[in-house]
Amino acid sequence: ATYKVKLVTPDGPVEFDCPDDVYILDQAEEEGHELPYSCRAGSCSSCAGKVSAGTVDQSDGNFLDDDQMADGFVLTCVAYPQSDVTIETHKEEELTG
């Protein structure tokens, strides 16, 4: 399946289609959108975003704890869309406080 991903970035919103077997960060780059990242392996917080609508599968990541995921935080480098989803990007500072 393919879902609509909306990223709310500091430069304004961008939307693109993302297959459910492609990481959101990878697809965003494929579409020409630059997002922050570092490890690309789900073990840091550089690419952190916050899901404001929809659901993702980020079971490949290990940096976020259950409380952070319950709050909506997501690591875009290891997140597959499971529905149409809206994500606010550039949330590392909010996540790490």
UniProtKB/Swiss-Prot annotation:
The Gene Ontology biological process annotation of the record reads: electron transport chain
- Does the entry feature the keyword NADP, yes or no? no
* Pfam families linked to this entry: Fer2 (PF00111)
Keywords carried by this UniProt record: 2Fe-2S, Chloroplast, Electron transport, Iron, Iron-sulfur, Metal-binding, Plastid, Transport
Q: PROSITE patterns per the record?
A: 2FE2S_FER_1, 2FE2S_FER_2
| This protein's GO CC annotations | chloroplast stroma
Where is this protein chiefly located? plastid
- UniProt superkingdom: Eukaryota
State any single GO MF term.
metal ion binding
Xref: InterPro entries: 2Fe-2S_ferredoxin-like_sf (IPR036010), 2Fe-2S_ferredoxin-type (IPR001041), 2Fe2S_fd_BS (IPR006058), Beta-grasp_dom_sf (IPR012675), Fd_pln (IPR010241)
At which positions is [2Fe-2S] cluster bound? Answer: C39, C44, C47, C77
Textual note on the cofactor: Binds 1 [2Fe-2S] cluster.
Needed co-factor(s):
[2Fe-2S] cluster
Domain 2Fe-2S ferredoxin-type as annotated: residue spans:
3-93
Q: Which NCBIfam families does the annotation name?
A: fdx_plant (TIGR02008)
What the record says about family reads: Belongs to the 2Fe2S plant-type ferredoxin family.
Question: What is this protein identified as?
Answer: Ferredoxin
Species this chain originates from: Atropa belladonna (Belladonna)
